[in-house]
């Protein structure tokens, strides 16, 4: 929503915002964009506006929203506003899937820029080489992450329905978002319905090995207007796979060779396999992984370099907190020294043989020098409850 506010400001709108808490770097970005915002949803924070764009974290019980509705003001969801004001006039390349959306979206934007395009883009992360997470231009292309999470309190469809993509890239489909989905079939159904709505002259690219056979077969049997293309990517390296996906997504614009050349100076996105400390004794990596598959892929990349690994996983996502991934996590945790953050009492019992809940005392042990350089991997989509800062302080002693 912060990026959307900045886009609206760049288009010339007067923009105000409100959130429960606003932290850096977003608070800094909003201030530098000249966007005034309030913290807290008290009724007094209402600002007279022509339209109120409502984020999907806002429930209909929100006090400020209640006041907006009482005053009979016009409300719209973020994805709906984006389509009505921008996407309806663009060629939309939508990057979807359980994992890798931010990385692949940023790769596409990066490759286009390095090949003299000025693409519109909206990325749910902070690319290290690009100036910001969004861009608005006169270019016909708009690259966007296509999230399967719900849109708004009054629209429980996935956000991606609003984007009406010309090119849809499906990187992978796994079970996630256990707070709104009961099983993977419900998620697949939404992807299937999205594909059915896509018109002729559109295209769907699917990473073949990362979706279920039943989903593939169902699509193959359906009479679709769109062109369906299953991608067989001959690599086991997740970084190389993401680059190939990016190349396929924009193959109508530039050649694969030019895309790969354009990605030679790509250095990633903040909080995606980001090294935040490195010396002769320790490397600390921060990663947004909050699903077992993403954690496994991240560990695999580290294992190619070292076997001296300490894993710290924050159980912060809705699916993690609900315990739907506990069995897979046990299999992951047993392969290295592992600590958890925010595990429930029941999860602590389940993980007790292979992992323990992180404490301040453990940090001293983790940050003790070994004969061999140690890599500490912290995975999660929250803030690690302050433990990351404590580890950094200990490593810097």
Regions found by a protein language model. Give the residues of each.
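Acidic, glycine-rich loop-and-beta core segments that form the ion-binding/anion-interacting portion
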Residues: 242
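Short, well-ordered alpha-helical microsegments
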Residues: 1, 61-62, 83, 130, ...
């Amino acid at each position: 929503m912060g990026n959307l506010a900045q886009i609206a400001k760049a288009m010339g709108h007067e923009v105000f915002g409100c959130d429960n808490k606003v932290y850096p770097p977003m608070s800094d970005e909003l201030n530098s964009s000249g966007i005034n915002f309030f913290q807290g949803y008290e009724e007094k924070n209402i600002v007279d506006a022509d339209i109120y764009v409502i984020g999907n974290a806002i429930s209909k019980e929100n006090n400020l929203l209640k006041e907006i509705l009482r005053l009979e003001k016009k409300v719209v969801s973020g994805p709906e506003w984006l389509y009505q004001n921008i996407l309806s006039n663009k060629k939309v390349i939508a990057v979807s899937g359980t994992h890798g959306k931010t990385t692949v979206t940023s790769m596409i934007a990066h490759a286009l820029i390095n090949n003299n395009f000025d693409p519109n883009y909206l990325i749910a992360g902070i690319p290290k080489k690009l100036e910001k997470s969004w861009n608005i231009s006169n270019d016909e292309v708009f690259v966007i992450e296509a999230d399967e999470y719900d849109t708004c309190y009054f629209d429980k469809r996935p956000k991606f329905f609003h984007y009406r993509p010309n090119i849809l890239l499906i990187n992978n489909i796994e079970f996630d978002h256990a707070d709104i989905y009961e099983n993977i079939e419900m998620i697949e159904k939404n992807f299937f319905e999205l594909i059915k709505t896509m018109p002729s002259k559109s295209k769907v690219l699917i990473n073949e090995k990362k979706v279920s056979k039943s989903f593939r077969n169902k699509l193959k049997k359906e009479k679709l207007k769109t062109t369906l293309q299953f991608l067989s990517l001959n690599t086991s390296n997740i970084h190389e796979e993401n680059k190939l996906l990016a190349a396929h997504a924009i193959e109508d614009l530039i050649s694969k060779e030019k895309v790969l050349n354009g990605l030679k100076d790509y250095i990633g996105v903040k909080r995606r396999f980001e090294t935040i400390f490195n010396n002769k004794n320790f490397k600390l990596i921060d990663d947004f992984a909050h699903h077992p598959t993403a954690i496994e892929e991240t560990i695999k990349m580290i294992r190619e370099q070292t076997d001296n690994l300490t894993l710290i996983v924050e159980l912060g996502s809705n699916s993690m907190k609900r315990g739907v991934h506990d069995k897979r996590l046990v299999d992951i945790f047993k392969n290295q020294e592992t600590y958890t953050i925010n595990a429930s009492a029941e999860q602590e019992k389940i993980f007790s043989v292979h992992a323990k809940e992180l404490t301040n005392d453990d940090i001293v042990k983790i940050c003790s020098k070994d004969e061999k350089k140690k890599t500490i991997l912290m995975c999660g989509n929250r803030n690690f409850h302050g433990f990351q800062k404590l580890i950094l302080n200990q490593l810097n002693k």
